[in-house]
């Protein structure tokens, strides 16, 4: 049975959304998921980190609304959220105009 779990999709500012994606591990995960949805076991092949840390990064991406999940029995498959790239692209001008100047 396939059960789709909704993304939480917090209302993040442009800078917050880009900060979520800017983490090197999360960036790698987003790139991998953009190429092909995967289960955790396949994602772990691309990021050499402990399973609990991988789960944490996937949770952050899911809560930001950048990743969706679907359940297949005991397995959870991850995919790039349909609007993720559009949201990141739209966040760029906002982040540039609202970022504090050092």
Language-model features: locations:
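Residue-level detector of secondary-structure transition/capping positions
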Residues: 37-38, 62, 93
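Short, hydrophobic-biased segments on the C-terminal half of alpha helices
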Residues: 58-59
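N-terminal helix-turn-helix DNA-binding core of bacterial DNA-binding proteins
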Residues: 12-50, 72-85
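Amphipathic alpha-helical dimerization/coiled-coil segments
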Residues: 1-13, 31-34, 82-102
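Alpha-helical residues within the helix-turn-helix
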Residues: 45, 62-63
